[in-house]
Amino acid sequence: MFRSKRSGLVRRLWRSRVIPERDGGDGNGQSSERNATAVTAEGQRMAQPRRAQEGEGRPVRCCLFAERPGPELPPPPPPPPPGGASPPGPGGGEARSRLVLLERELKAVTYALLKRLKERSLHSLLQAVESRGGTPGGCVLVARGELRLGAARRPPPHLLLGKLFRWPDLQHPAELKALCECQSFGAADGPTVCCNPYHFSRLCGPESPPPPYSRLSPNDEQKPLDLSDSTLSYTETEATNSPNVTPGEFSDASTSPDAVKRSHWCNVAYWEHRTRVGRLYTVYEQSVSIFYDLPQGNGFCLGQLNLENRSETVRRTRSKIGYGILLSKEPDGVWAYNRSEHPIFVNSPTLDIPNCRTLIVRKVMPGYSIKVFDYEKSCLLQHTAELDYADGPYDPNSVRISFAKGWGPCYSRQFITSCPCWLEILLSNNR
């Protein structure tokens, strides 16, 4: 009997799910996109002999059903007497059986959701999952109603697929933020919701450091960074007239005749250490992708910027930029979404401690987004803050983002100009 094409797409999606390396995660809140492994059925079969040698077998734990009550397990057997053999205990077998049951339930509810989708939506979803967001695809809209899993748990569709394909430790829809290009953006109460997991990012709280920044030094979570390098802040004029600017050839759609008629909301400068590479990239659209290599899409391609005699450190860092970031202008401020597979580091006037001689650098893990500039807070700071605390030039509308490499007291690089590859976002006052 022939299987339908839709059934084949559903099976491919199920085999592309993310399986955590550790049961329940590592507890540090780190992005599961770095700590999880996307496996296929073939990969699982190849891993079976090795798992059999590991004793416990490391079964997959389904986070979706973690809170669902199950049968009570018997107490662990007493330890074996010294020199005696360990008696067989039923507890381990029952625990593994329960995990297998939970995995089957997860598969059943996933299939139930995916079989609702049309073939075109399944293609779009599979394209996004297999490219890991390089080709995000279109919106995959489903009714906002929740899926029924017995009487214990009813996850929304976008939460289910977000856990399945990106973040196994995801617990609540409030942790997700729809990207500005998604139809679910700004439509929290709409009748439908997009369930494409690559149309969402995880939120970094503005008042707490993004995970896992505390892993570097628990005592330094709120420790501000020293701003004693007068080259840290540049105005747009200074950046344009910088003697270290090097020419670069790249496609710049922002200079088209139609774009010139509109007002821009920011300029982007790309730096390697103290040298600016290429010209300013002017942004007119609501969002812009800044990347090294992207399978589909347009924006500011850093891979096309040429510079002679690049150091090996810069070359290695450039190779880590990958899909880069998505920078978007939204009603409440400017947001940065980390699309790459490595962390980015952000400094912004609205992330700093007011009236302080130091600044704060935020570490943003892959798959997370952060509000890098808050319009309301910026207006408040410019009316109340004293600028005497700044050492050297200070631009209240400038944001700095370093790829893969941080700076400050936790690193050997004390200043942003010591980072191999970084961006300066020069925001326009005309909002």
Swiss-Prot record:
Gene Ontology annotations for the cellular component aspect, listed alphabetically: endosome; heteromeric SMAD protein complex; nucleus
Matching Gene3D superfamilies: 2.60.200.10, SMAD MH1 domain
Alphabetical list of SUPFAM superfamilies matching this protein: SMAD MH1 domain, SMAD/FHA domain
SMART domains recorded: DWA, DWB
Pfam families referenced in this protein's UniProt entry, alphabetically: MH1 (PF03165), MH2 (PF03166)
Tissue occurrence: Developing heart, eyes and limbs.
Domain named MH1: residues: 85-209
Residues engaged in binding Zn(2+): C139, C182, C194, H199
Domain of life: Eukaryota
The MH2 domain, residue ranges: 265-431
Biased composition (Pro residues): 71-90
Keyword Plastid carried by entry: no
Biased composition (Basic residues): 1-15
GO terms of molecular function: chromatin binding; I-SMAD binding; metal ion binding; transcription cis-regulatory region binding; transcription regulator inhibitor activity
Region: Disordered, residue numbers: 1-95, 235-258
Sections of the chain in a coiled coil: none
Biased composition (Polar residues): 29-38, 235-245
Location in or out of the cell: Nucleus
GO BP field: anatomical structure morphogenesis; BMP signaling pathway; cell differentiation; cell-substrate adhesion; negative regulation of alkaline phosphatase activity; negative regulation of BMP signaling pathway; negative regulation of canonical Wnt signaling pathway; negative regulation of cell proliferation in dorsal spinal cord
Keywords: Metal-binding, Nucleus, Transcription, Transcription regulation, Zinc
Job of this protein: Transforming growth factor-beta superfamily receptors signaling occurs through the Smad family of intracellular mediators. SMAD6 is an inhibitory Smad (i-Smad) that negatively regulates signaling downstream of type I transforming growth factor-beta. Acts as a mediator of TGF-beta and BMP anti-inflammatory activities. Suppresses IL1R-TLR signaling through its direct interaction with PEL1, preventing NF-kappa-B activation, nuclear transport and NF-kappa-B-mediated expression of pro-inflammatory genes.
Cross-referenced PANTHER family: MOTHERS AGAINST DECAPENTAPLEGIC HOMOLOG 6, SMAD
Family: Belongs to the dwarfin/SMAD family.
Name listed for the protein in its UniProt record: Mothers against decapentaplegic homolog 6
Natural source organism: Gallus gallus
Gene (UniProt): SMAD6
